[in-house]
Regions:
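C-terminal binding/interaction regions
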Residues: 1-42, 54, 150-201
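Short, acidic/small-residue loops that bind anionic groups at enzyme active sites
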Residues: 123-148, 187-197
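N-terminal small/polar loop signature for handling phosphorylated ligands or for N-terminal nucleophile
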Residues: 67-107, 111-129
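Glycine-rich phosphate/diphosphate-binding loop of Rossmann-like nucleotide-binding domains
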Residues: 6-13, 34-85
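Short amphipathic alpha-helical segments
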Residues: 58-60, 116-120, 177-178
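Short beta-strand segments
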Residues: 47-49, 106-108, 151, 165-167
Length: 201
């Protein structure tokens, strides 16, 4: 029943999906089994890449959903900024933010359009790539929409800042965050040498 609910929830409103005579006594494993909240606050920046949003022609919902998820996970402070799809502006801003923020997440510009410049701009700057993060995000998204395969998102470190590039749709951004959040929390615990279950003290 839980699998059915998980597969159907993107296609209807929650109140429209009713599964009767199903009782859950105990649940173990799955993403909810892993920690999704930081032990100590970590600074983060969320950059929304969109010509139309930057011009005020439509509101940003994807970036706001990422900010909300980070806030709930204990990231603080969080810098939020909207900018157009301009490579030079993005590169300069990210390099500036690496001086102050431990985690930098871009939203938008990971597709195959001519103005999707985020990946092409930031990938050459990555000093240590974390391919598994975006592999997890795409695998998670692919179970919900075939369009997840079109994302070219990358992740990795620039100096000591973790940079992650997410899709610009609200669904793509929020699902990617759901997929990578446990790993994201674990990464910053490890980076700060905090002991973790199963690791060496």
């Amino acid at each position: 029943a839980l699998t059915i609910y998980d597969m159907l929830k993107p296609h209807c409103e929650p109140h429209e999906l009713i599964i009767q005579q199903c009782k859950l006594d105990l649940k173990k494993g799955g993403k909810s089994h892993f920690k999704r909240h930081l032990r100590q606050p970590v600074s983060a920046a969320v950059l929304v890449l969109s010509d139309t949003v930057a011009a005020g022609r439509k509101p940003d919902t994807a970036g706001r959903s990422v900010v909300e998820t980070l806030t709930e996970a204990g990231f603080d402070p969080i810098h939020y900024q909207i900018l157009p799809d301009e490579a030079d502006q993005l590169k300069a801003l990210v390099l500036e933010l690496t001086q102050s923020y431990a985690c930098i997440i871009t939203v938008g510009g990971t597709g195959i359009g001519k103005r999707d410049i985020t990946v092409d701009t930031l990938e050459p700057l990555l000093e240590r790539e974390l391919n598994g993060l975006m592999e997890a995000a795409r695998a998670f998204g692919q179970k919900r929409t075939p369009y997840a395969a079109m994302s070219r998102g990358v992740a990795g470190f620039i100096d000591r800042s973790l940079v992650i590039t997410l899709p610009g749709s609200r669904g793509g951004a929020s699902e990617s965050m759901a997929a990578i959040l446990p790993a994201l929390v674990h990464i910053f615990d490890v980076c700060r040498d905090l002991p973790h279950p199963g690791g060496y003290e």
